[in-house]
Amino acid sequence: MIWFTGLSGSGKSTVAIHVAEMLRTEGRRVEMLDGDAIRAVFPMTGFTRSERDAHVKRVGYLASRLEFHGVTVVASLVSPYRESRDFVRGLCQEFVEIHVSTPIEECERRDVKGLYAKARRGEISSFTGIDDPYEAPATPELVLDTSRMSVDEASARVMETIRRRVGMG
C-alpha cells in the first residue's frame, strides 16, 4: 500500500498516477484509489472532521482488502488527520506513507477550481490548510515537495522508497 497524503493541489494524485503506471509497467496488479474520485461515487461523505475520518478509514479498509488479495494499492487522499492515517497503517500488511509537503502558496497557485480563494473568502468551510488543520505525518517513509522537483524525479524517489521499504524489485 502506497499512501500519498498532502494538501489539495500538492501534486499527490499526479505523482501517484505516475507511480501506479510505473508499477503496472513492471507487471504488477495495481489499483489506484483517488480521494476525489471516490467522493464522486459516494457524494454523501462530507468534510467535517468525523466525516473525513470515516472517509479515510473506509478507503483504507478497501485498500487493505485489495492488498490482501495481492493487489498493489496506490492511494491519494488529503487524509489530513494523523490518527486516521495511523489507523489505515494498522490495517495494511505493508504501508508506505508519502507526505507530499508542497508549500500552501504553491498549492494555491495551482488551484484551477479556486477552492483556496473560496475558502479564504469564507464560501467554503472546513477546507484543509485554511480553516481546518493538516496534521503532517510524524514519520513518513518519504517527504516530497513537488515545487522543487519534476513528476519524474518525485516518482523515481517514490519507487526507490518502495523498493527499499517493501523489497519490491
Where are these regions (language model features)?
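Conserved substrate/cofactor phosphate-moiety recognition/catalytic segment
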Residues: 17-64, 68
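Walker A (P-loop) ATP-phosphate-binding motif of ABC ATPase nucleotide-binding domains
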Residues: 1
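Hydrophobic anchor at the beta1->P-loop junction of P-loop NTPases
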Residues: 4
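ATP-dependent NMP and nucleoside kinases share a basic, alpha-helical "lid"
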Residues: 41, 45-48, 63-120, 126, ...
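Small-molecule kinase domains that catalyze NTP-dependent phosphoryl transfer to phosphate-bearing small molecules
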Residues: 101-104, 109-157, 164-169
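The conserved Walker
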Residues: 8
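Conserved lysine of the Walker
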Residues: 12
